[in-house]
Amino acid sequence: MTGMKMFKLWMVVMLLGLLPVVSEAQEEINNAINVQLEYLKKYPKDKEALRKVSFLYLNKADYDQAIFYGRQLFEIGYNERDYNGAVIYSHICLGQAHMMKGNVKEAYSHLGQARLIGESNKNDSALCSVYNGLGLYASNVQKDYYRSLTYFFKGVEAARRCHYDRLYS
C-alpha cells in the first residue's frame, strides 16, 4: 500500500472513531434543549430558560430556532427593562445567529447593541461573548484583521476582569 493510500485509510479510521463522540455531544445538546422546552411549556416567560434554549440552539447550529427564542427573550427582557440580563444576552445570541446565517447588518446591529449595554453596565461576562462576536465579524465580514485582534484582546481582558481563567490563560 502506498503512503497516500495508507494516510487516507488512517484518516477514515480516525474520522469513524470520532463519530460516537460527535453523536454523543449532539445527543447531550438535544437532551438539554428538550429539558428547557419542557420547562418553557410550564413557564413560557422564564428568561433564564429562554436564554439557555436560545444558546443551546446556537451551539447546535440551528440558527432559526436560536433566533426564534432569542427574539422571545428580547421581548420579555425589554418589557421588563432587564437590559443587563435578558436584553444583552438576546442581542448576543441574535447577533451570532444572524452572522452564521449571513445576515451581516442584523448581526452587527445586535452585537453593537450588546456592546453598548455591556460596556455601560461593565458586564464583563457578557462582553467576552460580545467581543468574540465582533472579532469574528471584523475578521470574516470586514476582512479587518487588526480590528479583529483588537476585539480578541478586549475579550481576553474582559475574561481576566471576571476571572474566567479558562478563557484568558
Regions found by a protein language model. Give the residues of each.
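Bacterial N-terminal signal peptides
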Residues: 10-19
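Sec/Tat signal peptide C-region and signal peptidase I cleavage site
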Residues: 21-25
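Bacterial N-terminal signal peptides that target proteins for export
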Residues: 1-11
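A "functional boundary" signal
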Residues: 26-169
